[in-house]
Amino acid sequence: MQRNEPLGQAQALLYEHFGYSSFRGAQETLISAILSGKDALGIMPTGAGKSICYQIPGLMLPGITLVVSPLISLMQDQVRALKAAGIAGAYLNSSLSYKQYLRALDNARKGMYKIIYVAPERLVTGEFQSFAASVPISLVAVDEAHCVSQWGHDFRPSYMNIAPFVAMLPTRPVLAAFTATATPAVREDILCHLKLQNPEIAVTGFNRENLFFRVLKPTDKKAALLEFVAQHRDESGIVYCSTRKNVEKVTELLKDSGISAARYHAGLEEEERREGQTAFLYDKVKVMVATNAFGMGIDKQNVSYVVHYNMPKNMEAYYQEAGRAGRDGSKAECLLLYGAGDVRTAEFFINNSTEGNEGGPQAIAQRRKIEFDKLDQMKNYCFTSGCLRHYILDYFGEDSPLSCGNCGNCRAKKRIAATLAKPVSRPQKTERSLYEMLRSVRLDFAEKAGLPPELIFTDRSLQAMAVTKPQNEHDMMEIPGVSPVKYQMYGKTFLRVIQRNSDRRSGVE
């Protein structure tokens, strides 16, 4: 069946800028709805490609696409990713000086940007509202849309500014909302508070089959952590701690054991946080030890494990953080190390939280009740003898088998081997040297461009190159993630490295 013209154009742009020949999951459904002028809500797991759903329409629609995003680091990473894909974008947040902010607005008026990321707090300022009323806005995309819900794990009152902002625009744009973690109650809140009009709703499922979940209750957490990390010494991983103090202790523990680690929490100077994040993204350190301040917007595909050294406050936070493992589709492990003190720490944070307290004592009491209910669900996860994957999916309202056969609890019961899909095999020994060469070339490009290596080519793309050894442009363009733009910018150099390696091996043989 012949594709309709807008979707055909969308697919061409997907290939040109991102190097993929077809859409995944609900991407096509949501993009088609947005292009037809329909509001949309996408509930898609981490790594499912939510940003594609508004970036591709953003390139096709006549006006500007505004993306409402909650964190400065998230916006900056997204704009860097656009740049790597050959797309001009900008962000408007408090990291800009007033002069830089005015210049960005002026450039936007001149049509230099198709996609602009903006903080929700910015929507209520008169200067930004005047700007928004003076330019054509075709689409407003809301990232991390669960932040609008008081039932969510990360309620942000500033997200309540979005619907009034859209209502004051001269012409109502298409409104699209996206999140990775939303229970049925949170979905209803998103629909209500954002005032989505007859939206296309796509819930693609929360199941990440490549993730292996396990809960341990060790008598010695430090020893358990060291044993686990030692087993994954050559792999990238994240260790989440509930407090800054624990981040410091765990970082010191790992370093004293000869493991390269960086730390990240809100109490550090911005420069140290940035240096640590960069070192992790560039694979200069293997382990990032962090509070929940780290992770949102960090587009690192090859994280092989996530360890929670402390139990999080709720399932939403746990699954979002655990979901930062295995974004390249390869097998990855999500380990939670439970201790009785974790509950007391979580209770302390809930009792002392100020989020959502603007409504007075009654609102505070209601918010705390919600948070304590969520904490109970989190504790139940740690103590269930049933399937961990089923527990997670059931929490988010998704049907699943009572046993997945491939989590810590199921394996303990059934003693079966993992049967996880592995779309791209990791390089065998014969390809390992070529793979390491390609990683070195990628790092050179990344450092010169000031981009994380994964934005040049993902590990999966490099693995595919090492396995298939493309010998010409046509072969290179068959590699997932090699777009025409990226081939011109980087691919020719990678091709020469592969060809030289092949010639050298032929000479030896």
Residue positions per predicted region:
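Helix-hairpin-helix
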Residues: K448-R460, M465-F494
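Long, highly charged low-complexity segments enriched in Glu/Asp and Lys/Arg with interspersed Ser/Thr
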Residues: C407-A418, K492-R505
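C-terminal extensions
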Residues: F445-A449, Q463, S502-E509
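Intrinsically disordered, low-complexity N-terminal extensions of nucleic-acid-metabolism proteins
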Residues: M1-Q2, I116, R504-E509
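Helicase motor core with emphasis on the C-terminal RecA-like subdomain
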Residues: R3-N4, G8-H17, S21-G25, T29-S51, ...
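C-terminal accessory region of SF2 helicases/translocases
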Residues: V285, N302-V307, M311-Q320, A325-G450
